[in-house]
Amino acid sequence: AGRPFATTLVGDASLSARPMERIAEPLRQMGACIETTDGHAPLTVGGGSTPLSGITYRLPVASAQVKSAVLLAGLSARGSTTVVEPVATRDHTERMLELPVLHVGAERHTTVDGNTRLRARQWIVPRDVSAAAFFVVAASIAEHAIIEMHGVGLNPTRTAALDVLRAMGARVAIVGEREVGGEPIGDLRVEAPE
């Protein structure tokens, strides 16, 4: 969005089944020309010579994907763009872009300044703690099992499954906690109960 060329975004069957109007609508409010296919992918983002305009967008439902789309589009918009979250969602985009988040009561307000140029840099993407949960469960119920997983993302917005498993008696240890690219990561060691 906001670039002088047209782009068509497609996806696999799973992605094409997801609703895209909830992402397209706030981008249209910013001035983007977006056409969906019956509200789904593929979608075409039309090029244009008019830059996007910053907006304040209140998420009608909790969605980290919509929030990220608006914030990333806001980087190339005129003025500032603010996303208001009535309920907190995953905060990977804010961490990656090092954005300040203002807490107003129970709400989170995240603002980006327009016409911001991103610098190229190298990123390390942590392993997905949601995918690791299956192995944590397996090791927790298999007799004499021990499993170690290195470099797992431990973003507090994604670790509830580990908390629940611990509460159920799973022996989950986190070692080597560190931060990479603004994201907390660590190594998981899971042992079957004695």
For every predicted segment, state its role.
Residues 1-194:
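Structural preference for solvent-exposed beta-strand-turn elements
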